[in-house]
Amino acid sequence: MRYIKIEDLLVFRSRWGQGNELWKNSVLKKDFRDFFHNKCWYTEVPLVGQDVHIDHFRPKAAVKPFENFKYNHLIQDEGYYWLANDPSNYRACCIYANRKTGGGGKGNYFPLADDGVYQSEKDENNEHPMLLDPCVAEDVKLLSFLGNRVVPATDDELGKERVRVSASIYNLTDAYISNERGKIWASIEQLLAEYASGDISKSSCIRQLRDAISPKAPFSACAIACVNSLAPDEIKSELDLIL
């Protein structure tokens, strides 16, 4: 998961019209898809050969309980309806993350931490979501990878639990997605081994790593985690490893 500054996308709000089902607007869907280089905002799965799904981060029509977590049961039958046409609540994603498939999928789940109060139309900022939000820089920093596995990048117990819940709901542990991340990790591990043995130059190694960690690359957050874990300091110092 990479940080996505949605404010830079919302400057195009006037292009999307005023429809009652704004998330279906074709221009909006293209803008959201293109903004993160044709990738899912949650999983970094390339959106090649599949439609982009516009997810409502806070569900628009209903809210379902997840495990034993608190949730906004006061609006369980109508959801966060007042945010249905608010593009700041939209996240572009793939079918793996958005729909209930396999063991995960976001659907209408929106679990909350025990602290905080329920959000209402008049009071929007007091809920504490368990789901990590790619549009919140501090959330993105909590999640990392080790090989094809999702791991927390924090010792905080609540942070660890948020990573676990997000990995499950966003389907980050799906077999296909995990396998593709594993390929990225293995390729970088091999590249660094070739650099260490002198088979490739430092400049060649850095050039290939820059491609792998680029926001345009699939699963680039996993690539960054691999570089942080395995690369020597003289390589890391030449790279932008900010999520």
Describe each model-derived feature in a short phrase.
Residues 1-26, 46-48, 237-243:
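A boundary/linker detector
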Residues 17-29, 71-79:
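Short Cys/His-rich Zn2+-coordinating modules
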Residues 28-53, 94-97:
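Short cysteine-rich loop/turn motifs with clustered Cys
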Residues 31, 81-82, 132-133:
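Short Gly/Pro-enriched turn/cap motifs at secondary-structure boundaries
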Residues 45-92, 100-118:
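Histidine-centered nuclease catalytic patch
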Residues 108-160, 168-172, 177:
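Long, low-complexity, intrinsically disordered segments enriched in glycines and aromatic residues
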Residues 151-243:
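C-terminal, charged low-complexity interaction regions
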